[in-house]
Design a protein with these regions (language model features):
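Conserved Rossmann-like nucleotide-cofactor binding loop
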Residues: 17, 40, 298
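Glycine-rich FAD pyrophosphate-binding loop
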Residues: 26-52
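Mid-domain catalytic core of redox enzymes
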Residues: 28, 265-402, 410-414
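Conserved FAD-binding subdomain of flavin-dependent enzymes
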Residues: 47, 54-93
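Helical element adjacent to the flavin cofactor pocket in flavoenzyme catalytic cores
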Residues: 207-277
Length: 479
């Protein structure tokens, strides 16, 4: 077996991608040091603390996240890594069937089968039994899905989701578009279906509804463990805050295995020399063999380009032209990214309990939308305070307070909660990249020894936790 040349690696950014890269690099025999400018791990999927913390009307303090994330059973790499760092998946995640049901119980709900013995059987049953769908709706969807499956869930890179559905024969009906395709597209790609990549959408659909089950190992105590299975289409909703779902356990695991996690250490400059990469942070100056940039694309683009061009000046002249072209290509791909916001409106209604932990809502889109939220989560059923709800507005538009007011009116009407009141509205302005047709996403490598990971990096998934983790795995493979 070939031995691994141990490298000293700096990882800039302590979000999900950065922490995943640190864990996987350590598993591969390297030494990892994570630099995080803030005092909180998790990036765009973390707990909100400090001056941004909130309370209920009676003064009860709340633990809120900066967004409402979900996983699915097909997110095999994320689930595997969570187990590696000691997270008990059954305690940390609420498993439920893929559900896009509305408060009136119409819409799609797959059966509550932990792991269907025939791939896609639960999806077929869910479509057959969908309330309010006519046989015309169901047959059109069956035929479209059958065609996508025969085509290997592949299509032209330049098709939008709307074009894909309109070209299906027969065309997918308006009801199925409104109650399945659009909400699924927004929740997975955070991009309206008229602008969303059909190829990426098909990949998500394939993995969620037509992929093998995920086997997971549950450690009950020091002496007892058992295996269980998640169906690929199972929704896995966090029942603890997002920082404690993976980033904090990953940090503890990393330190235990000899790595470093440096909070409050803003990297001010990185320079390349024959000795390696000199990382200059707030209170730390250290040389590394490799640097992995794991922050947001906008921040990493600025830093990465400056670092790469500076490094090229210290590389042999015969390589200079080639490297400059590679760096320019990487910069162009980052510049081509557009970003979409996600708003989370936390609201409270004393005694409120939804019919299930997550419901779809009747919504419209655009700056004039009167019903902007697509989903609502009952935090009381997810380990939080009873009566606390989280409304999610993907690809949100407009002023924070105007958006909040519209969501509260929408919630009062659609959930029949006349006393619903706002608690806090959090908008991540650059929550995801716009997953558009033909988009060429940045590569994992800017220059030799200068790598990148994050959910925006080239890969099969949209901007999801699984996309972030898989980009980290790919970056570590390049070490």
């Amino acid at each position: 077996m070939q031995s691994v040349l141990k490298k000293n690696i700096a990882i800039i950014g302590g979000g999900w991608a950065g922490m995943a890269a640190a864990v996987v690099a350590t598993q591969a025999g390297h030494h990892a040091t994570v630099f995080e400018a803030s005092h909180a791990l998790g990036g765009r999927a973390r707990v909100v603390s400090g001056s941004h913390a909130s309370t209920l009307p009676d003064g009860t303090p709340l633990t809120l996240d900066n967004g409402q994330h979900i996983l699915i059973g097909a997110y095999s790499e994320t689930l595997k890594l969570m187990q590696t760092v000691g997270v008990n998946l059954e305690n940390a995640l609420l498993r439920m069937p893929l559900t896009l049901q509305f408060p009136d119980k119409t819409g799609l709900r797959l059966p509550d089968w932990p792991a269907p013995w025939v791939v896609g059987l639960d999806a077929a049953w869910g479509i057959l039994t969908a309330k309010s769908w006519t046989w015309t709706d169901k047959l059109a969807l069956f035929r479209a899905a059958s065609g996508w499956q025969r085509g290997g869930f592949s299509c032209s890179q330049h098709l939008s989701v709307m074009q894909l559905c309109e070209r299906s024969k027969p065309k997918i009906t308006p009801r199925v578009m409104a109650e399945l395709i659009e909400p699924l597209c927004l929740s997975a790609l955070n991009t309206p279906m008229a602008d969303a990549s059909a190829q990426v959408f098909l990949r998500v659909l394939q993995d969620a509804m037509f992929s093998p089950n995920t086997e997971v190992h549950i450690q009950i105590d020091e002496k007892t463990s058992r295996n269980t299975t998640f169906g690929s289409a199972n929704l896995l909703i966090p029942t603890r805050d997002l920082s404690n779902l993976f980033p904090h356990p990953a940090a503890a695991w990393l330190v235990k295995h000899g790595g470093n996690v440096l909070l409050g250490e803003r990297v001010e400059s990185i320079a390349f020399s024959n000795a390696g990469w000199q990382v200059n942070a707030t209170a730390v100056k250290q040389t590394f063999d490799t640097v992995i940039l794991a922050g947001s694309p906008s921040n990493m683009a600025i830093a990465g380009i400056h670092i790469a061009y500076a490094a090229i000046n210290n590389i042999a002249k015969e390589l200079e032209h080639l490297l400059r072209r590679e760096v320019q290509d990487w910069q162009n791909s980052v510049n081509a990214l557009r970003y979409e916001p996600i708003a989370t409106v936390y609201a409270y209604s004393k005694g409120a309990k939804l019919s299930q932990p997550m419901l779809a809502l009747r919504s419209d889109s655009g700056s004039e939308a009167q019903n902007p939220a697509q989903f609502v989560f009952d935090r009381g059923q997810l380990g939080g305070e009873h009566g606390l709800l989280a409304f999610v507005v993907s690809a949100s538009q407009g002023d924070r307070f105007a958006l909040q007011e519209k969501v509260i009116v929408q919630g009062r009407s659609q959930l029949n909660l006349p006393d619903l009141q706002p608690i806090q509205t959090i908008i991540e302005k650059r929550a995801t990249f716009a997953c558009t047709p033909g988009l060429q996403r940045p590569a994992n490598q800017i220059a030799p020894g200068l790598l990148v990971c994050g959910d925006y990096v080239a890969g099969p998934y949209p901007a999801t936790l699984e996309g972030a983790v898989r980009s980290a795995l790919q970056a570590v493979k390049l070490l």
